[in-house]
Amino acid sequence: MNNFELRGGGGGGGVRLAKKPYDYFKNINIPGPEPWFFFGNMLQLMKKRMAKFDKEMKQKYGKVLGFYICNQPHILISDPEMVKEICIKQFAVFTNRYDMFPPDGVGDKFLSFLTDLHWKFTRTLLLPTFSISHLKQTMGIMNRVVKNLEENFSLFADSDKAVEMKQVFSCYTVDMIASTAFGIEVNSQKNPDHSLIKCFDKFFYVNFYDPITSVQTLFPVIPKILGTFGIKSNFSSSLQSVAKFSKDVIAERRKNKTVRQDFLQLLLDAKLENVDKIDDDMKHELETLTFENMSDWRSKRGLTDEEIVAQVVLFLFAAHLTTSTALSFFSYILVTQPEIQQKVYDEVMDVIGDVSFPKILAQDQ
């Protein structure tokens, strides 16, 4: 066998090995679009955008299908019962997520991207934030923020100008999160040019055709390489801007030594002291940790400052976009369907009347 045959055989083997990941869904009989070598279905996804891509894929391949981002397999599930099983009943099984953030000390430490026992531990610390008793304590604060929104609506009603409701609800949501979770008054409803609002706008309206952002999206390993050299896209820059805001909030809370029953206080109470002085025995214990001795871990292993900031940023982002977008669509439906608007109002007033936490809670019984 000559050198040409050896090289040809080696090259062919390399190509087959590179193509092997694209056989994953075929091997387990999950339908889906044919992937392109190296890119998978990523270019189709970017061209059509996520909503259109998902809709077309569901219509063509059914409620469960597989596609690839580069050589990484992804399963798209549109079956409500299956989604319920995965996200609620079996959620503890699906803890680890797709790793997409560079090592910037913020995004890579989000709860949603932590893995295994690190995820379980951090999630356990955050659970009290969403308890009924905590939500009840924040009702008065929430009412004040809603009052500001009502005053704004009155001003809108008295003017003949068009109103950008997405911006209105964006400011409202920021005010609600900042006051209930962090004990600070942003009042962006009165000041829509607040720096935090600008950070959110920059983050959520990322241009995915920006060269650096496109590369980071297409090739998940690239952000980690770029991040080590300090190269950032608008996405990463806006993330760092909100992280700086979060650090300032944390510093102010520590400086004033104020204790509140809120999300931020839970994180600060879990602060890991002397993080640089963990001995080798404890490091070994953390590395070999099992779920059974996790309660002992909590008493030893708190959260680092980076982890605290990351969860604050995640809380701000996760709560902001989902809530403000839902309210924007809801307001559009009500204003274009006045008969439905009146029906909703009448039923709320008939069943609940003036809103209070006990009345809301009673509706679930």
Mark where each language-model region is:
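N-terminal membrane-proximal hinge/A-helix region immediately C-terminal to the signal-anchor transmembrane segment
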Residues: N2-L6, G13-V106, L117, F121, ...
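Cytochrome P450 I-helix active-site segment
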Residues: I30-P33, M139-N143, H194-F204, T258-L266, ...
